[in-house]
A protein has these predicted regions:
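Axial heme c-ligation environment in periplasmic c-type cytochrome domains
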Residues: 31-46, 60-95
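Short sequence/structural segments immediately N-terminal
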Residues: 11-19, 68, 95-97
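Intrinsic disorder/low-complexity segments
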Residues: 4-6, 47, 97
Length: 97
């Protein structure tokens, strides 16, 4: 993608499917085999989403998440642009009920 180019909803969904869905699920509930193993939060629950800001979500998506020495999520900096990461955060926000 070109820097600063705006992504379509289909582009954002494709990024979700490629990079996020294996653990977080198509619906954001985290009830996949990997999601259950890693105890991924259910993003359809608004209270779970209120526990993190957009900036925190962007940082985790960019840099990854660790618990001690254990990697819970790889970072996507270098694979996804800053705009693609922000768009994924907006996509996650739409799961909340």
């Amino acid at each position: 993608f070109l820097a600063g180019a705006s992504l379509t909803a289909a582009d954002v969904k494709a990024n979700w499917e490629k990079h996020c869905q294996k653990c977080h699920g198509a619906d954001g509930k985290g009830q996949t085999t990997m999601g259950k193993k890693l105890k991924v939060k259910d993003y359809t629950v608004a209270a779970e989403q209120k526990k993190f800001t957009d900036e925190e979500a962007n940082k985790i998506t960019s840099e990854g998440k660790k618990e001690g020495d254990k990697s819970l999520m790889k970072g996507f900096k270098g694979e996804l642009s800053e705009q693609e990461i922000k768009d994924l955060t907006a996509y996650v926000r739409k799961f909340a009920k």
